[in-house]
Regions:
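Conserved short alpha-helical segments that host acidic/polar catalytic motifs at enzyme active sites
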Residues: 1-235
Length: 235
């Protein structure tokens, strides 16, 4: 099996349910340039950050909090940039004040975050897992520079995750992911956080100019009221 987007998704996330019915998410980071590959995922309590290797200088577009989770509410957010905390705290507020969560809140935050200010106008992507009327719900979103932010409901089916990516797959000429062609789905292999992180890492093997583009994957599974988080780093 190969990544459903193609060899170069840039950064990519999926959310859904494991085969046991547990809410889960998994996040992939890849990079074509040496600077983009010189990164790793770092777990810091209930957060996972994408940080530099060694003495590499801090870059706010490459180094950021990617995942935040909370056991007391069962909420988890994952994104490719500065929008993670805003999304997480918004849905935690909705949970605490007992307001029904909808995708529109995610869409508004993503529109405000805008695309990344780089030469490729890199899209921002994000996902949230929370609960609505006692059942797990999840929403995905993408913000491209050339269109308003879009948000989508995830069909929560056992053993399946739905995803969204930054780029549309080609290695040499990456363009922004187009959700109009449909969102990719995966049938998960494994039920634990490390299982799904390793699964996405393995199916995303690809090289640019002889160099493996994979940086890391992060998997998270909500089991028995607690988030199990695992990381697979290339370095």
């Amino acid at each position: 099996m190969q990544n459903p987007i193609g060899p170069y998704p840039g950064r990519q996330l999926f959310s859904g349910l494991t085969s046991e019915g547990n809410p889960c998410l998994v996040y992939l980071v890849t990079g074509r340039s040496p600077e983009s590959r010189e990164r790793k995922a770092i777990q810091m309590g209930s957060k996972v950050a994408i940080g530099p290797l060694g003495a590499t200088a801090y870059d706010p577009l490459r180094h950021y909090t990617a995942v935040m989770n909370d056991n007391s509410t069962g909420i988890a957010a994952v994104t490719n940039g500065i929008q993670t905390e805003a999304i997480f705290e918004t849905y935690r507020l909705l949970y605490n004040v007992k307001t029904q969560p909808t995708k529109e809140y995610l869409q508004i935050i993503m529109e405000g975050a805008a695309a990344e200010p780089d030469s490729l106008h890199t899209p921002r992507i994000g996902a949230i897992i929370t609960s609505g009327q006692g059942e797990p719900v999840s929403f995905l979103s993408i913000k491209r520079h050339d269109r308003p932010a879009l948000a989508f409901d995830v069909r929560m089916q056992k053993g399946k995750v739905t995803g969204i990516a930054v780029y549309n797959g080609p290695m040499e000429t990456p363009g922004p992911f187009d959700p109009d062609s449909g969102l990719p789905e995966l049938e998960l292999k494994g039920t634990g956080a490390l299982d799904i992180a390793r699964f996405l890492f393995d199916i995303s093997a690809a090289a640019n100019k002889g160099q493996d583009i994979r940086v890391c994957t992060v998997g998270a599974v909500l089991k028995s009221g607690a988030w199990d988080v695992a990381i697979v780093n290339a370095h």
